[in-house]
């Protein structure tokens, strides 16, 4: 079976994968980017834009390569779809770029993100926020939220040089709402983004230092508020205006410096988060796009782990039994010891049952599956590997599931699909 998106979404709701051996895998292609925008889907493709202009494109969400087009240069863009158009916000300078904290945030529209489309054309940029050299805020690192409760559009911006600020934009024009005043909502972070869930607004900020490869200390933290304007408070009651923030994701899996959070909703109850990692050790320390499951625990977002290739027990989450081939149980030979009699013979570990011990007893052709008590037997051990050149879905490849050491693949249907 090739484990496609639908199978994953349905299967993981009822199954738990217990890892017995592992191999981490990362996205393929050339996913090199810094300060990525929230991922957008447009006409069946995925797009994200980064610092310096340009961006990445993916046909399936797994293989990423260059080709995205975003004029204006500058830093740390973000994107949101409003109706049938895409609004892009980016920073012209700021963050110490050009020698100071003077900067501005601009917005522009496009009907499509596909540079090969005849409809591809950006509007002229509009300035919506600015900062001067001696100001206690940098106009950089834009984050966009289209509020699902009332349709209002919000822009957060700023760096650890000063305050994170919030302004309201007109969702019809992308311009700053007339008379709107900035609101300070956080300090000691940058690259903020806002999301809404179940009556709470969540402010995700990137804490720590950037732009130093494997030495970057970036991590993503979060606070929440009942009002979009704050105050944002973490799980310990600390205000983000006083440096609070609960950890969402830090370094791991030989990748350091996660920053620049973005949310992508795959389906009801299924969410992914995007970010960059300042240094991927397995890619020479380059900055790469990262995509992780976004999980929720006690009302707080936390990054899930990337699914790892390996050999697993596949366990029913509801009943706790293990998925297994429906084959005859093969008894293991062992030396019997009477419980009530003294036995001075040396203790020798039993060897586990091997595939060679049982495979000749298995029928040829298709074999049904069932659930049963897990006894770490060969008919209960499943190896899950990415399908070479098989494509993928947002943040992962398609997988094949076989009994360990065999080519007996798990099929989703009786027709071997």
Model-inferred region functions:
Residues 329-332, 355-363, 389-392, 414-416:
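Beta-strand repeat architectures
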Residues 336-340, 348-359:
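Intrinsically disordered, low-complexity Ser/Thr- and acidic-rich flexible linkers and loops
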